Curated annotation (Swiss-Prot):
UniProt cross-references to InterPro entries, sorted A to Z: Asn/Gln-tRNA_amidoTrfase_suB/E (IPR017959), Asn/Gln-tRNA_Trfase_suB/E_cat (IPR006075), Asn/Gln_amidotransferase (IPR018027), Asn/Gln_tRNA_amidoTrase-B-like (IPR003789), GatB (IPR004413), GatB_Yqey_C_2 (IPR023168), Gln-tRNA_amidoTrfase_suB_CS (IPR017958), Gln_synth/guanido_kin_cat_dom (IPR014746)
Domain of life of the native organism: Eukaryota
Gene3D superfamilies per UniProt: 1.10.10.410
CC terms in the record's Gene Ontology section: glutamyl-tRNA(Gln) amidotransferase complex; mitochondrion
Swiss-Prot/TrEMBL GO biological process terms: glutaminyl-tRNAGln biosynthesis via transamidation; mitochondrial translation
Organism whose genome encodes this protein: Candida albicans (strain SC5314 / ATCC MYA-2876) (Yeast)
Subcellular localization, as worded in the UniProt entry: Mitochondrion
Subunit-level organization: Subunit of the heterotrimeric GatFAB amidotransferase (AdT) complex, composed of A, B and F subunits.
Gene: PET112
Source species taxonomy: Eukaryota, Fungi, Dikarya, Ascomycota, Saccharomycotina
Protein name in UniProt: Glutamyl-tRNA(Gln) amidotransferase subunit B, mitochondrial
Family label: Belongs to the GatB/GatE family. GatB subfamily.
Keyword terms: ATP-binding, Ligase, Mitochondrion, Nucleotide-binding, Protein biosynthesis
Chief location: mitochondrion
Amino acid sequence: MSQISMFVRKLHKFSYNPNYKFKCGLEIHTQLKTKYKLFSLSPTSYNEPPNTKLSYFDVGLPGTQPLLNPEALLLALKASVALNCDIQSYSSFDRKHYFYADQPLGYQITQHYYPLAKNGYVQLNKFDDMPDKVISLEQVQLEQDTGKTVNYDDRINVDLNRANTPLIEVVTKPDFENIDQVQAFVRKYQLLVSHLDICTGDLETGAIRVDANISVNNNPRVEIKNLGSSGEIVDALKYEYNRQVTLLQNNGKIIQETRGWNGIATESLRKKENAVDYRYVPDSELPVIRLDKNIQAQLQNTLDELPDSVLDRLTKEPYNLQLAHARNLLFQPEILDYYENIFGRIRDANKWFFHELLAAFAKSDVEFQVDIVLPDMLVDIVSSVEKNEISLTGARIILKHIIRNKSTKTLPQLIKELDIGKPEASAELEEAINEICQQIINTNADVVEKIARGHTNALQVLIGQAMKATKGKVHAKEFRSKFMELLK
């Protein structure tokens, strides 16, 4: 059996060896949601035809100079504050020299000597399904992305649309003691930057790319580059931990290197470079960034409510949501806004929102959209049920009709059109209810027999048929009462 096959088998039954301590740090590259690129006026582009969104500076044309995008700086500062970092009053840009086809300048503009922010932290906690754990951050730096190389027809093609896209690189300390903590941190980070509209938060599209530095028993660290999904992160770390443990058990030596993940195994890419190899020098074409000493407090006051705070609020009085429901709302800000709009305006808002409204969208196979069933419409529907103007079944019929037909009619118009208004109480109505119930009893002898044997849940079958026969005009409790009377 090859070494790779052996390691792959171990992935499926992974466990930590208590004699070999797992230690990991992350470098997270995050594309900022700006209109323009970091140092040019080219629009940021992710889905356009190759090499169509470029400026002379993006392609490294001699004589062109960089111009800092203030929107990118603001988003980087927002992220730094949200990550509990210390904003630096003085920061600057440096050139990181290396040659590769997707980097036309021959260097990357980054912040090596004086980064934008330092000394942050992220708190893992119950909202991440984790014990309390603080992950410390080294720094946050603003830098430019590279282009992309694409292998096609035995050629390497270069697409520079992504070149000079603004990034922040978040560097953690090696505080991760297991892979579950890594997963929880990445999920939390994704949620944070997407919630604050700093980044889309997508791993799969490359908006967030993760490099992991892993070591065992404080041996030299190995960097795994460009992990593009949660699954890749987990599998690559499991594989690399097993590889290093096996090497040490066989008296091998861990070398500091950069490795890639090919979907099955990590593979060596190059010996790990150090700062000298990159020949960092200050970028003389970009001025230093000097920030007011009050910038940290000012930014803190402008930030939206952070995810942990939202989850804490939603799981307490008066909302009392389950954590799973609160998370779902947090991941979908439009739905959260809708929920908070109707909460307090109707009784039992959680039942109506989750079990009636969202269920109606799901059953209709339609993605939730605020403008299909407006908050005021839902409030009116609930009010009509509470006033006994329509039944619960009638409300469900109306919701499904609006969703499936994108109806913009008023509630009274829908009640009339669908003929689901509750009939006026009268002797004739009582007689009609009695006749319907008796007819259903006569045609469902097997169900009646189950009820007689004590299977009271079977009564719902009869009630459901009665509700269907009356198109939901009569409340289920009235049918329940009549069936129980007739079946005594």
